[in-house]
């Protein structure tokens, strides 16, 4: 049921993504979809298709490769937890955000940076956890797309650095046990 609702929401938001005339509109549409979806870890088939309007070519390629690595690891080592199987890749916090407010936007020469102010309910004290990350965008094929997320929250169990950097580091080395050739990051950068 949730998958059907997510798909319906994505279809409603696709026209908005195609018409997004500013970095802010792209970010708002992307995170509206992201927070409504049940996606965890690297996106799977339909999720990847739904993300296409909002993400840059290289980032989409890296996420697809992360999904392939996850699937190979799960098949080759069924008793071990594969990489990219869970957690929110699009924010610092593993559980992901529930609410978003946009902060400062800087824009120059077809590139933009948008401050992201996230909130999530904790069910503990304090009841709301707040953090900030930053989205980097670029114009590709006449539209604004997300090309990276800088993780800025200082959390013990979460993402650190930046999304592209994390994906590249995990995807580049070959792993014969998984029949993984590596070099995915190099291939995606072309």
Where are these regions (language model features)?
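Bacterial N-terminal signal peptides that target proteins for export
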Residues: 1-8
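N-terminal signal peptide c-region/cleavage motif recognized by signal peptidases
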Residues: 13-17
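Core segments of small alpha/beta cavity-forming domains
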Residues: 21-81
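Surface-exposed, charged secondary-structure patches
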Residues: 56-128, 184-190
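Hydrophobic/aromatic beta-strand elements that line small-molecule binding cavities or substrate pockets
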Residues: 101-104, 132-139
């Amino acid at each position: 049921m949730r998958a059907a609702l997510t798909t319906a929401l994505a279809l409603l938001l696709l026209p908005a993504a195609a018409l997004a005339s500013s970095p802010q509109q792209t970010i708002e549409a992307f995170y509206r979809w992201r927070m409504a979806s049940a996606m965890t870890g690297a996106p799977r088939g339909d999720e990847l298709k739904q993300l296409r309007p909002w993400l840059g070519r290289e980032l989409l390629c890296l996420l697809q490769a992360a999904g392939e690595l996850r699937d190979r690891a799960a098949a080759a080592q069924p008793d071990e937890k594969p990489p990219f199987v869970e957690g929110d890749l699009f924010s610092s916090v593993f559980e992901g955000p529930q609410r978003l407010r946009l902060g400062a936007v800087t824009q120059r020469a077809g590139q933009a940076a948008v401050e992201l102010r996230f909130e999530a309910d904790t069910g503990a004290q304090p009841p709301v956890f707040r953090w900030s990350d930053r989205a980097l965008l670029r114009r590709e094929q006449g539209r604004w797309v997300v090309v990276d997320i800088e993780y800025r929250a200082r959390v013990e169990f979460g993402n650190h650095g930046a999304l592209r950097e994390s994906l590249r580091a995990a995807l580049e080395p070959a792993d014969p046990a998984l029949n993984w050739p590596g070099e995915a990051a190099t291939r995606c950068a072309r």
